[in-house]
Design a protein with these regions (language model features):
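Conserved aromatic beta-strand anchor motif in extracellular beta-sandwich/beta-rich domains
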Residues: 121-127, 183, 269-271
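Solvent-exposed, conformationally flexible loop/turn segments
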Residues: 98, 145-150, 284-285
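Hydrophobic beta-strand positions in extracellular immunoglobulin-like domains
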Residues: 107-109, 157, 258
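Secreted, periplasmic, or luminal enzymes acting at the cell surface/secretory milieu
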Residues: 1-116, 122, 147, 175-195, ...
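Intrinsically disordered, low-complexity Pro/Gly/Ser/Thr-rich segments with frequent PxxP/GP/PP motifs
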Residues: 129-171
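Extracytoplasmic
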Residues: 176-180, 187-293
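Short aromatic-acidic-glycine turn motif
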Residues: 52-53, 123-142, 275-278
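Short structured motifs
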Residues: 88-93, 137-142, 166-167, 239-243, ...
């Protein structure tokens, strides 16, 4: 919802669903101060529809969408919500214990108002081998904390929650490296951070001599993925494809399985910023009648 102008003049905005016959009583309790709200947004609210990707573009990684990849300043971030109470975070500790990441912290209600607080734990990998989220929710807890009191929070996060899908090997993997963990009241309101080393796999390079499936790209521009019922597999149509972390080895030639719709086409292979080869692709009756060039 684009309510940029309204929120400049309103100290708070209550967002609710129909919520049933008790909505009126609940609403009255909130606006009168008898109850301190602690709802949190489960989505990112952008300032304008122009910040959204085209409706036919569903790839949130390429389009830097959702709280995972968005680099702008949203109207309201993922996990956001107001409260009548005020909380302070302290004593943040993060450790790797075997297959578990142990996280602990203290949260103090420094106001006189009793209220729930939703503690959110996010993480990101530093210098990943592929594009990873800027922050990713990995745990949260909602607890009632009386005014002036402190609550201790502990989270045991399975290390498998840090995994990503390695397209080069078509499997999930926890990559070895440095991970930053963040504790906050929303995806933008981060109060404490800590970076630790996490054991895992060293992602191996792509060995071109073993072949690469076109669909297992790291990035693309202008290309579309299609599916051939005849071949029972996906193929890429047009544009360009990017494959990172490749090893050419001692190869002296490259084979590409491809086809062209109507006109004679051309495929160019670049490696390390240099053009390795170019191949002419003759037109066929069916684009999925591939040939090796």
């Amino acid at each position: 919802f684009s309510i940029c102008e309204e929120q400049e003049y309103m100290p708070a905005i209550i967002y609710t669903t129909h919520a049933g016959p008790e909505l009126g009583n609940a609403f009255a309790d909130v606006i009168s101060g008898r109850y301190s709200p602690a709802g949190r947004l489960a989505q990112t609210w952008y300032k304008s529809e122009y910040e959204l990707a085209p409706i036919e573009c569903y790839n949130i990684i390429e389009n830097d969408m959702t709280y995972l990849y968005y680099k702008g300043k949203p109207l309201y971030p993922f996990g956001y919500g107001l409260s009548y109470a005020k909380f302070e975070y302290s004593d943040f500790d993060v450790r790797e214990n075997g297959d578990v990441i142990s996280v602990s912290l203290d949260v103090t209600n420094v106001s006189e108002t009793d209220s729930d607080e939703v503690v959110q734990i996010y993480f990101r990998m530093e210098n990943p081998s592929v594009k990873r989220p800027l922050r990713q929710l990995v745990a949260f807890a909602r607890e009632h904390i009386k005014g002036g009191s402190k609550r201790h929070f502990e989270f045991d996060i399975k290390k498998s929650e840090l995994r990503f899908y390695d397209v080069s090997r078509e499997c999930f993997a926890v990559e070895q490296g440095r991970y930053t963990f963040m504790a906050g009241a929303s995806s933008e309101d981060i109060r404490l951070t800590k970076t630790i080393d996490v054991s895992g796999e060293v992602i191996p390079p792509r060995e071109l001599c073993k072949g690469i499936k076109a669909k297992n790209y790291d990035g693309k521009y202008g290309a579309k993925m299609k599916y051939s019922k005849k071949l029972e597999q996906h193929y890429m149509l047009g544009g360009g494809l990017i494959y990172n972390n490749c090893v050419l080895g001692d190869a002296d030639s490259i084979e590409i399985v491809c086809g062209s719709r109507v006109n004679t086409g051309k495929i160019t292979v670049r490696y390390g910023g240099k053009t390795l080869c170019e191949a002419e692709v003759k037109p066929t009756v069916d684009v999925t009648e591939f040939e090796t060039v």
